[in-house]
Amino acid sequence: MIFRWLLLVSCLLVALIPQQSSAKKSDQPKVTATKLEHEPFSLFYFEDSETVLMSLKNGEFKQSFDGGEEWEDVASSEDGRVTQPVVFIRQHPFDKNKAYALGVDGHHLVTTDQAKTWRSFDIGDQPALQHPPLVFHGWDSSKVIYQSEECAGFFCITVRLLRESAAGCSWAVGHPHFAEDMDLNQELKDRSLCVVPGLKVPFGHANRLVYSDDYFVSNIEGTEVNLHEGRPVSGVISTAAVKKFIVAAVKSKGTEELALFVTTDTNTWHRAEFDGHRIEQDAYTMLESTNYSLQVDVLTSPSSNMGVLFTSNSNGTFFSRNIEHTNRDMEGTVDFEKIAGIQGIVMVNTVKNPKEVKSGQAKKVISRISFDDGRSFQPLKVGDKNLHLHSVTTFANIGRVFSSPAPGLVMGIGNTGDHLQKYSDGDLYISDDAGVTWRHALDGPHKYEFGDQGAVVMAISDKGKSNKISFSLDHGKEWGSVEIEHKIYPTMVTTTPDSTSLRFLLVGKQNEESGFIVYSIDFKGLHERKCEEDDFEKWPARLDENGEPDCLMGHKQFFRRRKANADCFVDEEFKDPQPIMEPCKCTAEDFECEFKGSEDGKSCIPALLPVPPEGCKNPDDTFMGPSGWRLIPGDTCIRDGGKNLDHDVEWRCKDAGNVPTSGEISVEKQYFDARQFSAYYYLERQSSSSGNDETIVMLTSERALYVSHDHGKTWKQPLKGEAINRIVPHPYNSDGAFLLTDGAEGFWTVDRGQSFKPFDAPAPPTEERLPTLTFHPQYQDWLIWTGAVDCGSGDCHSNAYISKNRGDNWELLQRYVQKCEFESREGRKDSTNLIFCEQFENENRNNRLQLVSSKNWFSDSTVHFRDVINYATMSEFIVVASRDTEKPDSLVASSSVDGETFAEAKFPPNVNVPVQTAYTVLESSTHAVFLHVTVSNSEGAEYGSIIKSNSNGTSYVLSLGAVNRNFRGYVDFEKMQGIEGVAVANVVSNVNKLSDGEPKKLRTMITHNDGGQWTLLSPPNKDAEGKDFGCSVEGEGVPGCSLHLHGYTERRDERDTFSSSSAIGLMLGVGNVGDHLGGEDEADTFITRDAGFTWKSVKKGRYIWEFGDAGSLIVIVPESKPTKTLYYSLDEGDTWLDFVFSDVEMQIDDISTVPSDTSKSFLLWGKELKSDYQDKLATVSVDFSGLRSSSCKLDENSAESHDYYLWEPKHPFQSDNCLFGHVEQYHRKKPSAQCWNDWREPHVHSIGENCPCTRADFECDYNYEPQSDGSCALVQGLAPPDAMAVCREDPEAYQYWEPSGYRRLPQSTCQGGREMDHIVSKPCPNREEEYKKKHGISGAGLFFAIVIPIAVASAVGYYGYTRWDGKFGQIRLGENVGTSQGLLSRDSLLITIPVTIIAGAVAVIKALPLLATSLWRSASGYVRLGRNRGYSRPYASRGSFAARRGDYTGVVDDEDELLGVEDLEADEEEEL
């Protein structure tokens, strides 16, 4: 007992003796190394943990739970399966517990508990490469979109398809801050956005943005997003979620300019304005932004990689300029970084010598810092010296460049002096006051990182191999070091995302042989104690010019920060530093312009000033309205005692945005010192273009250039004194044009005539009638110049030169050429550098002309044809006319789709032209070439046949015979713009009498199914004066009584077409009603509103016309006849009003408007008669915009609205509205609507369900010709096409279809119905077994085919037996007749046996067709099998229709292309 007490007392005494500290201070950090055979590819920490994930370049996937000391392979917790190789790992950005690992084999992993467990899931499609493979929901971390190369899907626990054929999908809530202050949780929680192909065109300029609130379940197409003024926009490239914003980038065809649309709720979108700057594709970078503004850097100098930094207002609509000449690299990376955790501090690098850089000198980069959110910038200072630091474009680590969550600690590699030097010559600099002052830290470049909220700073030399780690415990004032075991080339240094840990990870490469090493470096033992309250300071994050704490967003910001000299660690892992906010009184900096600011920045311009109820009677009257200022959302300033800029102010009525319009048409007349114009072109803004100009460039007969930006109201002479010979508009960029002179000098504009820059060509323009300039479709600065060489000697010839910088430099491409063209096309594989040239053999003009091509600027080339006459490019086809080797006086046509393989065209036998002298390529926008083959080229008797190709342009069928052409080879054929498949042509009705000298008699015909069937035009019943025509018919026209129109061959300007792509369904023409087309003096003017079904007489006599405002406005004026009056219609030609545009009579030769026909202004070209200006060219600008004051309201999601209705094109031979196998719907303004369309890009509203196949979806096959009843019959004496050719051409084909006489129209999407091209299939030779497998009936199928009819027969017989009551036709009410045992009772053998036999026999007879059908379907694989490989497939959905490759646009803008011997004649006036 005593011993126990003594033991207890001894223990107590020992306990009272002072003990040595358990946490003994160490001089060195703890270092642990892990060797790897392969390089780490991706590495990250889970937030608030020591767990690290790492993937290696060979696909290995590892994890560590102790900050990198020990590593293990990641495996599924379900089956222990290791997912390798892993191609992508990603931490969920909004859920710190989740991460995803995507495997290359479709097997993937997800963790929801920071890698403690992993769950596998399978998606077979490969992860996307061009888009982020995983897209995360900002509110609900269980929702993820998986984007693959094939499609896009979303998954949580299960995986299901989201949207096929999407160019990219995202959640509407792409960030936790999105719509966080709005009551939109239910509306947005499941909303997804997808960029999808256009309904008719799969190329980028037609892409649409759609959304769905149920993962596209109820509507596979989704609902189109109204991006611009409540209407959808085409050309959507991508979307991006940036804090509380979503940004959509849009680019229209024909311009490089982008439009950015911004929303904060996905419902209301606005176009962002950039203070006069234009944004181009791949020329802007979305930077790290705040919760209250977007920051964007816009490329201004592509060749020298410089930009301008912009910051938006709080709704992202108006951007103000922050700083010019920001430094960028080729990938669009910008030297820009916000200091982490501190509001308003931004570091950027700019170019000091921008002018010298543009002339080819090296950049001199300097560093700048802003402490007021980019309003002003100042240099970085080390004492009195300027400091320049390497930034994002030369960053050599991961994570942020300069800062971390450690408050106020900033580091960088650079130098003092005039400008930034090479990275290898830089030193390490540090600041502990958020960049206000800097000091030198270590010599040489280093990789660096912050830990323990800045209490530890670690660095390692980045100049060669090193084994020395430097560290500082006092904000970089003094440095210690520790050596590691191996010398390494460091590749990355990192730590926990919040920089609160004392443990760092260092990855380095030892040498080529020994692989990589991962070091875990733990500084926990370097201080003995944890910091106490006295070791902290209240540190102000921003200081003003007086050194006092500064206000931003209505408050001052402070941090509780460890003092630099405190000998302790904060040691609060995973506890982020929290800012302390103190409010300030409101100042002007707390307000922003609601719309945009004035030029001086001192006031705001409101988006719209509402006029008070009493209205504005006089422009100088005043009223009280909003100032245009507003408090920045999120600003916390105190209004009491501060500034208040958002109160109402006084405005004058003339400043109001909705003052009633004048109700009048305005006119401006201008005169020119020339008798006439030589040429004019519109440089039209596209939908994504900024500005509101309507630009025209015009060349007079005196070779003077004039430019107007207001549709001819005023004109300027920007190149006065320069003799311009020709205007060449850029065919792929409507902002650009080139102006050529007689010499080697020229000018160009790429900003719609705002400026013109000179360029020097390598030679004067070619003296032959050849294209001098040709352009690349995608790279719009790539040019080919064809110039005249050695013309002073006897060997004048043309050479081709190429420039890739808009004429700054030229290189010789080919010598002795006729023409050279880029043949790059969307959908044509590997064609970026593809060029075709017509070149004389052996560079001798006396030799044959060859067609050659090259993909490497003719370092080597391919000869396709050795005796070519000409070639033409139309849509996806290259068509070549070459001499027939067997008939030198005849031609052979060949075509290619890929630009590599050419196939000779197979002409139909009913086009019998023994000597083929000329072809005219008419049009090929519907996956088929329309080719006019000249049959007769006798003067005054020219005509030919229009033949139409299959989808690869090789096999032709007759579409229409005896089609009129003129001596120059142009053809009376025109496609209707805006609606596919409608075309008008003039045929010669008296072909047999032309040889007798009788003049041609023309009739006009129309097709509604792309040339498959043609009819005469239906004549109107009465003329414009209400009088009857000499004949009358109901429905389509008949010989002797139909409408005939003067066509393409009689036009002064090929741009004066019947129709417009924006005026859907409308056509105007000049002609007459009768047996054939009469003279122009007999012609009247006619209009159709239903795409040519019915016509109405508009005016007696010949008029010229233009459409405006997408068809809601039509203007006509007498052609070449003294007049001072024009006529206009606001209801699609139903009624007409007159307007006197001149006080003296004029002769009007032309009327013009923008090519899209969407303007409300028109320009009349002519001369005054009997005036002092009668010898001068005059233009009259007529502006109708004052007639109406409002825009029409369109609801895309509603079939009908107050201002619009849905219109469907029809086919004359069908009762439904199916055209090419589907129903199209277009929005058209109601003629009675008193508003303007104001829509620059009308488009298909929808493509309805695919229709069953009918005769209209097919045309006659090769060697077949149409009969009088519309059927197709084999031409007498000819054999059907070789159906087995598909078996020889395609080694994978196992079947072929016997010729039926029909082939499907390439653009038809019909399904089922009368599939007239596929009736009987047969196996390919040696593929019978596979054919049987696909078509043969299985044992189970045979069993059911036999048993089911017998069972049905038995059931029917039994039914007849059990229901027989001996009283046919009786209605039994309550009788108990079942007990009757008479001869006619149902139990009688006289009844039971015959009834059973008869009923069974009837059932079997009725079942036999079902059995036959069942057997046939079984033999056909039940579901109809696919067609021959390479054939156009039908479509199961509108989604699949939208995915179809090809171009379904309207008529090609280019004039007809001529291919023929006649091109060689000296009198040929046109050359293509």
Curated annotation (Swiss-Prot):
Q: Which Pfam families match?
A: Sortilin-Vps10, Sortilin_C
- Any stretches that span the bilayer, and where are they? 1336-1356, 1389-1409
Report membrane topology. Multi-pass membrane protein
Where is this chain glycosylated?
A: 291, 315, 952
Could you say which residues form the signal peptide? Answer: 1-23
- Source domain of life: Eukaryota
First and last residues of every BNR repeat: 64-72, 369-378, 429-439, 706-716, 801-811, 1127-1136
- Official protein name in the record: Vacuolar protein sorting/targeting protein 10
Originating gene: vps10
